[in-house]
């Protein structure tokens, strides 16, 4: 599903974020206790929705542990109050993720069916990187649910690396969500 070039492109943004050239505008920034997040967005004229990129730093977070938490669906169900339903499903030899997300009234919940892959890679400087790619896939064995909007154009990349400092500090040098577009079809 994912090519080496997909992962390489995501990892390149560690050194050279593709924001202005791609038409992203600064949206907001937040910082707390050594954690910083900068959010950029790109407007889609056709859909009227935005794509988002988030770049941030987490103090005292090991990127390998962060990647394990990111991939652990059972643990996510424990802490994420937006999870209505979340599980893996095998289809055609591939592990798919089904995720039904609670949205506040009066909005409808959204659900996603996507394939994801985690790769441990090496940066161009030789540092270890954990990269996750996720993308919507069709799945006829999980029918759409009444009152829930199926998101069929989900694309996400998450790239985690260390900041190289002594100790357990880590950096999410690039955590960007492409096409978190909540389309109804």
Task: Tell me what each language-model feature is.
Residues 1-185:
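Eukaryotic helix-grip
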């Amino acid at each position: 599903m994912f090519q080496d070039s997909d992962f390489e492109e995501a990892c390149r943004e560690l050194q050279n974020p593709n924001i202005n050239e791609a038409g992203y505008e600064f949206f907001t920034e937040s910082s707390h206790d050594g954690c910083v997040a900068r959010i950029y967005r790109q407007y889609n004229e056709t859909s009227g929705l935005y794509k988002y990129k988030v770049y941030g730093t987490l103090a005292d977070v090991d990127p390998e542990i962060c990647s394990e938490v990111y991939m652990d669906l059972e643990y996510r169900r424990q802490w994420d109050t937006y999870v209505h339903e979340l599980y893996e499903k095998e289809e055609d030899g591939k592990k798919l993720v089904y995720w039904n997300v609670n949205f506040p009234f009066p909005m409808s919940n959204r659900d996603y069916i996507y394939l994801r892959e985690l790769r441990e890679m090496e940066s161009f400087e030789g540092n270890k990187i954990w990269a996750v790619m996720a993308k919507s896939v069709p799945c006829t064995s999980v029918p759409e649910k009444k009152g829930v909007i199926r998101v069929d154009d989900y694309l996400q990349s998450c790239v985690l690396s260390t900041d190289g400092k002594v100790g357990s500090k880590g950096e999410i040098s690039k955590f960007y969500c492409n096409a978190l577009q909540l389309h109804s079809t």
